[in-house]
């Protein structure tokens, strides 16, 4: 008898363990957002602690966090450092796993005060949730008194969301009873993607070295070297190296302070730096900076201010560490026409990062790069540096093309991949054509090989423009499925009614969904998938803005996150067992379509 009971128990365990083997492909194995990112908060007078318990295999994006108070004044919340995550479409972004705690200091709050918090996350398996917003009630507190003690308007115990959070059923996420849930603001690329510039702090070092060889900077180094040495030509090598290094550190101090100020200001505007109109504005600024590097106009400090700074620097005594350091610090404030545009571009990069360490470190490396040739000249003389000539103007123009790449990077987020490719093509053709024409004056034999390479690169870069002007090959013309967009429950019902007699596939898409981009690029472009979908009505919902209408549609369809693809039969009824959640490659999706149509 005991043997039979043990056997029965083992059979039951094995049944539950292997049940997943027979699940329909594409069925959701993802939990609701409230379970993936369990949110909690506690308030003790002026201190509010926001915490997220993040399920294994899921993560939150740092750049998607926003905080706003109504009826209260708060300090800017300080998010901890996360880990770096990279994907094909949106590059590097900072994410949080496991557990996240964010302290918020409430300076003062009214009785009806609230704190609105927005976040967004994804699963490693290729599934992204819409932005979540919680409105938290705050206990009323007055501003701290002169003796530093907080004063509560009402003697209230700590506020916590713990009693309100019961795990929702796996069918649909439900908000906590005590918390009001509102739709999140629009997000232009996902948090992994707030339009992060393709730049790192180490690039600043290389840019600084390059700027040193422009016509506004390199000819000044012999004069600066003499001033640093105090007119003394017979200093020991160690003494000359020390003075040059101190001068560069003084210059670096000014730039580092500027980086810290801009990064601190950037913390207040990170959310704004994700909106399309801001990206367009930044692109226009970068284009103007690039044009200044091409010599169309000059960007620099007013001449009167430059004169005052120069006179102040000249009053400092060269040859002494203190005087040399002060001269370097003042020199950092004098922006020449060649340094203004690259410096402005770096400052915009720092502002959109909002990271103090990154801001200070980036401009320190930039100043160090500019100072390295000065150190070499001060210690070894002119023999290690190239002679001045027309080539310095070419270096300046080349930096103009580098800066011009930044608006292309930003605008392709708004215009889409196709226009982005065309813009990169235009930039490539312009750069390689300029480099080819510039090299024609060279007389050295090996430059002929360089000219051939530049000409070939220009022709290759022009390919997307040729396809645009003369038409892409047939294979590329049928690369994308033609979806009909619907934006509400009523429009969806109407489209299903009009499609009576035909099967329907509904794709839910958003710009912040990386796996949606993968579906578009790798799956929907497959000839096998396109062939299998012939005779199927293709509908698509874009929920990028996460508007109330989008939220209502997702709730109506019981969709947890994206990508999600729904299938309807000829009678307009959803076949829920065929629903796809998460990314599927072309082969798996083709097989899924065949099973659906069988």
UniProtKB/Swiss-Prot annotation:
- Disordered: region residues: 147-187
Reading the lineage from the top rank, the first entry is Bacteria
What are its E.C. numbers? Answer: 1.8.1.8
Where in the sequence does UniProt note compositional bias of the Pro residues kind?
Answer: 165-176
Give the UniProt entry's GO cellular component terms: plasma membrane
Report the family membership.
Belongs to the thioredoxin family. DsbD subfamily.
Q: What is this protein called?
A: Thiol:disulfide interchange protein DsbD
Taxonomic lineage from the root: Bacteria, Pseudomonadati, Pseudomonadota, Gammaproteobacteria, Enterobacterales
